[in-house]
Amino acid sequence: MKCHHAWKGARLFDFINQRVKVVEGSGLFINLIDIDSLAVINAFLFNYGQQENVKTKTVALLNIGSAFSNLNILESGVPRLSRDIHIGGSNITQRIADATGENFKVAEELKINSAIKKAKDFAAASDLVLSNLASEVRTSFDYYESQSASSVEKIFLSGWGSLLAGLKEKLSSYI
């Protein structure tokens, strides 16, 4: 079992080294390599860390990516809970593909165009995915609140998936 973990670590190291060589080959210098969750937290705190509602309150950062979403709960700017949720924009795209009979690429274009035009055509296709995502977020909030004296007061959304038409309203109603 230990060899398996060492092999995973070696593959990850090789993967990172390949990316570093590409970046450095373009004349840029890498100062820091971060994991997704910490990168979102660092970017958020850099931009909003001095705001009173971030410095003194408990907030959640929900980064909705393609394959998965990251949820981070910060209490007075300090990370208290971080987890990956294996639901992302591609799940919505697949539901649209299933509903329309189109291939994944066409469904992705339909999803992107509906986000830009704020069309409601794909609400039914996205509802199940969004309710599952909201359920995972709510479960995380419940766990955090059972371990802490505070509760999440505000959610900040990021990631391409956060641009989906009606997402904020649906998450608000589910959570």
Which stretches of residues belong to each language-model region?
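Hydrophobic/aromatic-enriched cytosolic interaction surfaces used to assemble or bind macromolecules
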Residues: 1-175
